[in-house]
Amino acid sequence: MIEVLLVTICFTVFPYQGSSIILESGNVNDYEVVYPQKVPALPKGGVQNPQPETKYEDTMQYEFHVNGEPVVLHLERNKGLFSEDYTETHYAPDGREITTSPPVQDHCYYHGYIQNEADSSAAISACDGLKGHFKHRGETYFIEPLKLSNSESHAIYKDEHVEKEDEIPKICGVTQTTSESDEPIEKISQLTNTPEQDRYLQVKKYIELYVVVDNRMYRNYNSNRDAINERVYEMVNTLNVMYRPLNFFIALIGLEIWSNQDEINIEPEVAVTLRSFGEWRNTTLLPRKRNDNAQLLTGIDFNGATVGLAYVGTLCSPTQSVAVIQDHSKRTSMVASTMAHELGHNLGINHDSASCNCNAGPCIMSATISNQPFSKFSSCSVQEHQRYLLRVRPQCILNKPLSTDIVTPPVCGNYFVERGEECDCGSPQDCQSACCNATTCKPQHEAQCDSGECCEKCKFKKAGAECRAAKDDCDLPESCTGQSAKCPTDSFQRNGHPCQNNEGYCYNGKCPIMTNQCIALGGPGVNVSPDECFTLKQNVPECGFCRIENGRKIPCAEKDKMCGKLLCEKGNATCICFPTTHDPDYGMVEPGTKCGDGKVCINRQCVDVQTAY
């Protein structure tokens, strides 16, 4: 392991408290002035090991006084903040898309905690002075540079001393709960998980987040891309702190700024904007940039007090693993709270009821958006989230970044297993593992493993023990090898295997059925049209074609009519097709879909299932 330089910063408190000041985060009515003084500290033993050429240290300590009491703030660089293939995209005045891969690994965004305080946390930017927030003795404090000429002065203040931008409570636009949440939480909490389910819940999960900034927000910050970047980095850094208790790690995989014009129609009606953004992600973003979830930050003022909206229980869905958030506050912590709330909906969590609580402070999933950066998930939210994970098991969250992809030096205690490490359970103060040595990031004596579906009581599970049950007709169960803590790669039924009571045939691990495809396009209550619609619509250019050649729609042969444009019905409306966007596959019957007894759609042709694969 590479020894890391520890840096101690001493804060000298200014002899008076300010009465009122305008800071970058807003008007502050009461604050303390402190002067950070950086004091290098040698590692234990007095020998300073060579360090890689970096601008910012991996680990730092800050010592200062809060209300006259000395505290030590430990900080560690959030090495999981950016994905290994992070990109930034903006647009030239002529509309050209410009995408770069900036070197962001030597960044200045940190997580931390107050020494000797169990329930403390921090999210700090050290890019230009110290900016962020930390929790001390149950209260949230903010720190921010005063930016006075020839001065290193900073302000420390509490949330209650920030002048509110308006008195109207901010709310989330989600009004309907998912059907799975109709069961009372009290009843859910009485259910007992199987050992396999408990192991799945304990596995670390990762969300690769793509953030889009619309044109109005871009102009609100004087068309300054650097200012936008820093703002988004701070938000995602805070988002990470809020999701750590759920065992989720959020990596920013891309940031896109619509610097020329908006790429979708953004309206004050939040549901319309959400739907448009979801379609854009599916048809435009995903083909060029993989991601697990996308959030749109907008400068528009949504109708009423609404500042965000998301689909519920849709993580990993191409069109619905999205959220839209109004950039409703100067303080990044407040917007980050809204981002956390809407992502919670994507993860299957509904609004908390009156019986839910978070011990102290506001709950993240309250229908009224919290202005506290360290609000927590209630026990109701945790149970609801776990129920969603066990029911749906979204696969995209299990894509763990490879240790070889992390290019910065390894740091023991940051929860990421990196080069030279066999486990990483966090700092010695935070480590909850009986199998991992938090100081060395090696297994404890005689331990074979720390975590994984095939790890039990620090030992590999026996060969043949099931580690991943079949989740549906097209999936196969996996068993441990006895030689590894990891469950073998997910495997599927052969293509052409009957599924869903012979309604379809398996194709690449899924059971494509027209009814489900109609629901994905048109929402609940939509069904596939009768067979005669597929014959009638062959004479309608927009709905009766199998492929497009040189801009011309080619009609389907009679035998292939069920493999072209998908036709759906809802209520009295029959034979509905969905207009083709610039994505030629949008609204088409998916490959592998059943088009007759013993027949499937392959390359827009209805062929015998025995010869198709």
From Swiss-Prot:
Glycans are attached at residues 282, 437, 572. Residues 205-401 form the Peptidase M12B domain. A motif (D/ECD-tripeptide) lies at residues 473-475. SUPFAM superfamilies: Blood coagulation inhibitor (disintegrin), Metalloproteases ('zincins'), catalytic domain. Expressed by the venom gland. Residues 561-574 are annotated as: Hypervariable region that may play important roles toward cell migration. Ca(2+) 1 binds at residues 208, 292, 396, 399. Residues 1-20 form the signal peptide. Gene3D superfamilies: Collagenase (Catalytic Domain) (3.40.390.10), Disintegrin domain (4.10.70.10). Binds 1 zinc ion per subunit. It is found in: Secreted. The keyword Translocase does not apply. Belongs to the venom metalloproteinase (M12B) family. P-III subfamily. Snake venom zinc metalloproteinase that may impair hemostasis in the prey. This is Zinc metalloproteinase-disintegrin-like MTP4.
